Amino acid sequence: PVPRVQLGFFPTPFYKLERMSKELGVNLYIKRDDFTGMNLFGGNKIRKLEFLLGDAMAKGCKAVVTYGATQSNHAMETVSACRRCGLDPILYLTAVVQPDEKDVRANLLLDKVMGAEIHIVDIEPGETEDDAEARSFVMGAEHAARLTASGTPCYDVPMGGASHVGSIGFANGFVELAEQLDELGLNVDYVYHATGTGGTMAGLHAGRKLVGSNAVIRSITVSPKNDAYLTKVQNLANQVLADLGSDLHVDRDVDLHMDTGYFAPGYEQPNEKASEAIKMLARLEGLFVDPVYTGKALAGLIDHIRTGKVEQGSNVVFWHTGGATALFAEQQMLGNIF
């Protein structure tokens, strides 16, 4: 068995969004992974961190290093989980949005409240976000190696928790959803979610194979992605299946459905469709999605319904992966949401 530490409150709620369903002409259900717990601002990463930190503790680690943008949900949830487990959290955060030292907000504020060791990695002139991110990975790995060599074993958690260890948490998540669907006697046609680093996507596909579901999983990207990304997700999913002792396989060309049409103009940059989706859900259901991840995924789903990519009357699940702290982040991330 894979080592696991209990962090979240599962199963997370699952129910129908009656007013949104009526508005859109489909049966729209929501999976509330913003309710995974740990702290007030839970999210999908808790599922992964149960296995990642379980692995870290099984290996005798005392510290954890991880990565993200300055307002990373994953980084904040990792710090929270580390504190719960008695591990020292170290963050290497890329300044996609430059934080204001005098006005620290949202996830970065929470990281500081929890006392994480934070290293801000600025994007140098002539560098892309990806370049700076790659540099942060090297810095973090070197930091972990130094600590380990000096007698404090340090565990390196990849950005977004996207590893075969972390993705087991999301294979479990899909199995959990399947059990909730069974209880309600429901067949689902589509599952929609936001994808960033690919760990959630890989886990969902592994879980779908394990339960033999016919649901089509559609992944709305929050940053530019290409074919290499799909290959990475396929390989991650297949590693998860192998880890769980299954000989089933995810086939990139048959199983993976990714739409890159909703992240523009870029990561952590708002757009009109996401702003409309945020307002629609808030005004019809009193629920919140964020401008970086879930708002863009919901915008993709709404657009797919309106353009007939999702047939009227379909049963659709929107997987809420959390991240509403972004509503309290720097203004340039927000867009026109009221």
For each predicted feature, which ranges?
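PLP-dependent amino-acid enzyme catalytic core
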Residues: 1-338
